[in-house]
Amino acid sequence: MTIANWPACERPREKLMESGAAALSDAELLAILLRVGAAGKSAVDLARELLHRFGSLTALFAAEGRALTSVRGMGETKYAQLQAIPELARRALAESLRLPTGFDGPAAVRNYLRLTLAPLPHEVFLCLFLDPRNRMVASEEMFRGTLTRTAVYPREVARQALVHNAAGIIVAHNHPRGTTAPSQSDIRLTHELARTLDLIDVRLLDHFIVAGQEIRSLADCCDRLPGL
């Protein structure tokens, strides 16, 4: 039975219009995006198959094109649609960090960092450069490493802070396939960054570690960081 033949209260689009997006399951929301399924399976069936195969929304949105288009009912158009969703979310969150009021808490920053770093298979060191009102003026990937290691140079971070005339910086890196537990080298790097930035009167506000959907603030274990 196609979705068009379902009772109106069970159709994802009608259900969303009636009760709001929060009332829908992951598969139902994904089905609205996919629009159609394939011969013998509805868009909801296809959405459930994708979630089962990839295990989570995060893994699905991070999947390579070849893996996605190998699923019957998926093609380049649907792959492009799936790629657009997290990118739009990242851009919307980045916009919110540039609002005149700046950010009034860590939630938006954490969400932005999750969306940016969680899907990556390699380690990346990211810097958010802030103006005196805590508005983000730039987000830059400063260093990129292998699965387990990235070389970070505090002087390069300080140089970019001067380029952006930043008053403060938030840094973050991911632990692909790891945990958010900071290593001793993570803590040493944080102290070294804070000392280097102090020399040019720039505050290091926080250092976050992202692993999957988990995120940890090093302000909790580093007394040099004021936190957000």
Curated annotation (Swiss-Prot):
Zn(2+) binds at H173, H175, D186. The keyword Transferase does not apply. Residues 102-224 form the MPN domain. InterPro entries: MPN, RadC_JAB, RuvA_2-like, UPF0758, UPF0758_N. A motif (JAMM motif) lies at residues 173-186. GO terms for biological process: proteolysis. SUPFAM superfamilies: RuvA domain 2-like (SSF47781). Keywords: Hydrolase, Metal-binding, Metalloprotease, Protease, Zinc. GO terms for molecular function: metal ion binding; metallopeptidase activity. It comes from the Bacteria. Belongs to the UPF0758 family. PANTHER family: DNA REPAIR PROTEIN RADC, UPF0758 PROTEIN YEES-RELATED. This is UPF0758 protein H16_A3033. It comes from Cupriavidus necator (strain ATCC 17699 / DSM 428 / KCTC 22496 / NCIMB 10442 / H16 / Stanier 337) (Ralstonia eutropha).
